[in-house]
Structures are given as structure tokens and as C-alpha cells.
């Protein structure tokens, strides 16, 4: 092992696990360590995590990855951090102890407060204009307000000026730097409902609306700023290296950067349990006419912020899981391509709308429910599997169309990542139905790579994104092979099917 050699470490703190990956100059993964942590569900719709457990698990993976790579802290050029967004921690700055569990992004306990605020059209429009977001329990502000109102210890610490608040990146940086730095980056700040994306600062008006004192919030920095140095003893008892934290971004924004969607109109879609699609819209703030979110993608030092439009599909890979676990149609999701190809032999127009929990963008109908259309006497399991894969692509296509319309131009290609990318049938159908090119990178760890890229570029470990483009490479490309008549016919059928599922749960 060359002791002069330098590496980049990326910490990836997800919703259910923490990972650390060590990258070298050629973007090889030298070592990886991952551990899960606990989720708590104290009441229906409540989701919590233990901030001290998150910290100890993340620290353990950081040490483990370094040891597996057989390197010293002196060999680490910089560290990047990416994290689950919106999840919030409040803690005592004197002893580093949280005053309550972390309230997770999925947590719905503040739904009634959000409903109440949304009844005031002026407030609703002000918040949308200044944050790019709707007032929703998903985002951080009402979670902080809930803790301040319901946890006596939080009120006591606030009165004594000992209280700090932050998203998970802020909590980890505070711990890593030995309590020296209380900071966040623009991408994480933009998910709190307290950060004004028109001025790129915390907003007193937003603080007043949500009853959150700005004094407890971290300093907001560009995504590749110097967020402080890691205390050497966090690596090992004998470590001496002062390793800088030089890249921070929320997970979806990190994936957009990791996919090198650095020019306007570049789109990435993560095909996971659901789909997260983000489009780079450049330095000009734009608001969606289709209820997509406007968010800060990132900001590099001495440059203007880059904004993004974000849309999500609630059920993507989860629909394949439903086929496997609830209907027992197949043993594993890996079989889906086999069945889809089998179904192509006898053409049946089965359409499945997997609206298990309503439909997200661009429909925004919480009372839509799932339905399967076009079933005949000879419909078999393979037709259902094929329809499920196609449903994932149809839903993503609805987002693509919404984004193209907001941008006023067509989208020529999307970069894909996530588990469901393994389905060649899905990726080909996506290219066909959206009439564009789908590109899958060689390294699908795009979220972690985004954090690594930000940190590495900040310390000149890599020269620029052009160099990174050469290093990332393309694993697969899918181009449209469907003629326009067939595409229109299939799209028309999908649109009709969706229409028939809307408002289902609200029927008397």
C-alpha cells in the first residue's frame, strides 16, 4: 500500500442504514462498510430514530471502511457526506445529548398543523414562493415546532440558550468536528421550509410562520465549503491526520451530482421502492405548473446556486414486491424480465395502476387507489408482471412530461439508478414510452459518489466534471424502438386507466 496515495471517503447516512465508501482517483471502490440502525414507531404515522445510534453506527462504518482499505487518516484527502433529508435532531450543545429522538422525514404527526396552515391561502402561497415547497409534514419545520412545543427539556434548553437544531448532516458534522461546527449545506437547508431559496438565507418570516427561532439553526454553507476538520481520535487513538469535510448534500441532490447532471435539462431518476426524479434547471429559479417541488440542487463556492425540479412516484419497486410477497406471483423480483418477455408472445393490453397510497405528481390525488384493467380469461401471471414493469415506466413518464412542460422543451435522455434498473425490460420500455435515451452508469452508487465528487473537486483531487465523466462510464444505454402510433395508443390507454382510479377512496 502506497502511503503517499490519497483517497476520498464518502459517508452515506440513509433512512435505514449508514455506509462509508473509500474511493481512489480512478473511482474504484477500495472499501465499503455498511450497518443498519433501528427505526421506532411510537404511534401510528410516527417514525423516529435515535440520533446517538445513528452517530455511533456511522462512525463505526467510517472506521471500518478506513481499516478495510488499510489506510491511515493521513491518506484521506477529504470526506464527503450525504444524508436522508428533512429528518431533524435537537440537542444540548453543552453535553451533546439529544433532547428527543430524531423525527424522520416519513413522520406524519404534524399533519393537522400543516392542514391548519394550508387553510390560509396567503401563508400557503408565501411558503411556496420562498421555499419552493408545499406545507407538508414531510419537511423539517413543523417537526422542530412539535419538539419545541411538546418536549419540556427542549423548552428548558432553549431558555438557557443551550439548544441546537439541525438535519442529519448538521448532527454528524457537529459530532465529527468535536462540537466545533454547527453548519449545513444549501441543499439540506432548502428542505426545512425555513430557508428562503430566493435570497439563500434563513427567513425570519418563515421562522415566525412555523414558530421556530432562527437562533437554533446552523450556519448555511455552499455544498463544497470547508465544513470543518474531523477530530483525529475519531479515526483511531493514534491518528494525527486533520481530514477536512469538503462536500455535503442531501441524498437526492447528491445523486443528481453523482450522475453528473450538471447542465440544465439533465434528469436523473432513481428507481427504488418509489421513484425520485430530479431535473437540473440551472441558476434561474423556476416554479412548476404541475406541483413538482423546486429545490436547491447544490451551490459551489463563489458560484450561483443551481436549482432543481423534483417529482416522486410513491410506488415503483414496491409494486414488484407486492407481486412477490402478497400475490406470490414470483419468487424474486429478478424473475420479472423473464415473465415480461414471456407475456410479449401473446399480446394482451393489461394495464396496472399501482396507486396503493394514492398518486403523487402530477396528479396529487391521495384518494386514488390501485386497479388492473383489461383482464381476460386467458390473462396469466406473466401479463400482470409485464403490466407492473410498464406501470413504473408510465408513472416516470408522467413526471418526464410534467418536467418537459415546465421547462418548455423536450427531454432527450435520463440517467437512471436504483434497484429496478436491473430490469432491462423496464429500462427499454421507459426509453420507448418516453421516446428518449436511458443511460445507466457503471457505478450505480450515485448518491455516495455525489458526496465524493463534491469533496474531491473541492480539494482538486479531481480536476473537473469532465474528468469524472470519463471515469464514471456507461454500463448500459437504451434507445427508443417503438413507433409513434404504438406509443400514442399505449399512452392513451394508460391515461384512461389512471382517470378511472382517481378519487376512488373518497366515493361514498
UniProtKB/Swiss-Prot annotation:
It is an enzyme of class 2 (transferase). Glycerol binds at residues 85-86, 138, 251-252. Inhibited by fructose 1,6-bisphosphate (FBP). It holds the Pfam family FGGY_C. It catalyses: glycerol + ATP = sn-glycerol 3-phosphate + ADP + H(+). NCBIfam families: glycerol_kin, PRK00047.1. This is Glycerol kinase. The lineage of its organism: Bacteria, Bacillati, Mycoplasmatota, Mycoplasmoidales, Mycoplasmoidaceae.
